[in-house]
């Protein structure tokens, strides 16, 4: 059985979180580290936006500040995500890995098998949403909203028809980086405050529909889960789903310094976060 590296970096600031994902991608591409799975949280709670999103057009920065949230642009695509009461994961693995299909959606399904097993470990009957009709496929290509959890995408994980985990993927330097959110609890009012809408009516309609489309884990359970229980379930889930053994790892001082350098040069800058 193959051994992958496991890093639980705890709650970190948004720039550090994105910088560590980028550093892991770089180190893996250089052959310095094995494939890696990382768990993390956010301090402060943060709005992350997709690589291609337009801040001015889509994001209500006044409310981001009012809610005292961090703000960062991800290196991956997708839409806006409020990282608050959630477990965030990232998977870093070479495209050349024998178990990784060349197609993005298929690789996504393989990696997400670990998440699927994690939900099952928690007693939740999760399954993959696969768009069946042309209409559903078109909805993926032309998302109606800036809010990530608004609709399941290819192979997104769903429980009772509602999305439970959102993920995004990028491929750089021959390496796949997939990261995503497993949401324990969600403050819908806060989430919907963070985006711009053509009118208040549109916001109300979207927020109403959202309830039918996305659901945090603890809403599906009689007894709320602690973060430790969730971490254990998904760590076991990744081992089972990917048939790997995860070996805990702590970054060296030199590695930490490199991550902080990337954070400073990219993810802490307005040039990156507010780029046109």
Swiss-Prot record:
Pfam families: LplA-B_cat. GO terms for biological process: lipoate biosynthetic process; protein modification process. It catalyses: octanoyl-[ACP] + L-lysyl-[protein] = N(6)-octanoyl-L-lysyl-[protein] + holo-[ACP] + H(+). The record marks 163 as: Lowers pKa of active site Cys. The keyword tRNA-binding does not apply. Its EC number is 2.3.1.181. Residues 31-246 form the BPL/LPL catalytic domain. Pathway: Protein modification; protein lipoylation via endogenous pathway; protein N(6)-(lipoyl)lysine from octanoyl-[acyl-carrier-protein]. Keywords: Acyltransferase, Transferase. Monomer. Belongs to the octanoyltransferase LipM family. In the reaction, the free carboxyl group of octanoic acid is attached via an amide linkage to the epsilon-amino group of a specific lysine residue of lipoyl domains of lipoate-dependent enzymes. The reaction proceeds via an octanoyl-thioester enzyme intermediate. This is Octanoyltransferase LipM. It comes from Halalkalibacterium halodurans (strain ATCC BAA-125 / DSM 18197 / FERM 7344 / JCM 9153 / C-125).
């Amino acid at each position: 059985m193959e051994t992958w590296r496991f890093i639980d970096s705890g709650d970190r600031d948004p720039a550090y979180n994105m910088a560590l994902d980028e550093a892991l991608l770089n180190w893996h591409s250089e052959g310095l580290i094995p494939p890696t799975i990382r768990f993390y949280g956010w301090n402060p709670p943060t709005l992350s936006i997709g690589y291609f999103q337009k801040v001015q057009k889509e994001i209500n920065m006044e409310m981001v500040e009012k809610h005292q949230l961090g703000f960062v642009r991800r290196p991956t695509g997708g839409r806006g995500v409020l990282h608050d009461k959630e477990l965030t994961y990232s998977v870093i693995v070479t495209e050349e890995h024998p178990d990784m299909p060349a197609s993005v959606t298929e690789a996504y399904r393989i990696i997400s098998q670990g998440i699927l097993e994690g939900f099952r470990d928690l007693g939740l009957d999760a399954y993959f949403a696969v768009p069946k009709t042309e209409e559903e496929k078109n909805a993926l290509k032309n998302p109606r909203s800036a809010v990530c959890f608004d609709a399941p995408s290819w192979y997104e994980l769903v429980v009772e028809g509602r999305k439970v985990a959102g993920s995004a993927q990028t491929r750089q330097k021959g390496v796949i980086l997939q990261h995503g959110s497993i949401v324990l609890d969600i403050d819908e009012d806060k989430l919907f405050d963070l985006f711009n809408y053509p009118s208040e009516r549109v916001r109300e309609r979207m927020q109403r529909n959202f309830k039918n489309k996305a659901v945090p884990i603890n809403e599906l359970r009689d007894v709320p889960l602690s973060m430790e229980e969730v971490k254990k379930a998904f760590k076991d889930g990744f081992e089972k789903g990917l048939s790997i053994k995860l070996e805990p790892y702590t970054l060296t001082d030199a590695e930490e310094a490199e991550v902080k350098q990337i954070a400073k040069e990219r993810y802490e800058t307005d040039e990156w976060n507010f780029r046109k």
